Amino acid sequence: MKALFIHAKKFCFKPTKKALKSAEELSSKEEVCRENPLVIFLTVEKGDTEELLEKLLEDVRVQFQRVKPSGLVLYPYAHLSNELAPPGEARELLRRACERLGEEFEVVCAPFGWYKEFLLHAHGHPLAELSRRYP
């Protein structure tokens, strides 16, 4: 599992079309925008397990305290690895990550298996960008 954390002034995304046949149907393809979120670009890799979510949650808690965002955006992002988990496994781990994060934070979860356009306006402070790899 790999994550890229970006503290954004503004982040917007809009689903455009399915990237996977098995992608869930969406009730809306409207653009979603958040001001001052901590955006988590997350890649699920082969062999990743739910235990890794605990490590991710720990890092989210720490980063949340450091940068004081208004909430979180969890954004499935396959481009951080070339060792991707099968889509069904990735979708399930991302679902669990969204669920777990939602227990502690206000979170928006971008859809898995969709092409999405996005707008990212990042803060420029020293803690605005952070990458993590979870073994």
Predicted regions and their residues:
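Non-catalytic terminal extensions that flank enzyme cores
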Residues: 1-14, 25, 33, 37, ...
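Conserved mixed alpha/beta catalytic, RNA-binding, or beta-rich assembly cores of soluble enzyme
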Residues: 9-67
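Active-site-proximal loop/turn and secondary-structure-junction residues that shape catalytic pockets
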Residues: 10-12, 78-80, 111-116
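Phosphate-backbone binding interfaces of nucleic-acid-interacting proteins
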Residues: 52, 82, 86, 97-98, ...
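Alpha-helical scaffolding segments of alpha/beta enzyme cores, especially the outer helices
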Residues: 58, 62, 89-99
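Short glycine-rich, basic-tinged beta-strand/loop micro-motifs
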Residues: 68-84
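Short glycine/threonine-rich loop-to-helix capping motif typified by GTGT followed
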Residues: 82-91, 121-125
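Divalent-metal-activated hydrolytic enzyme cores
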Residues: 94-135
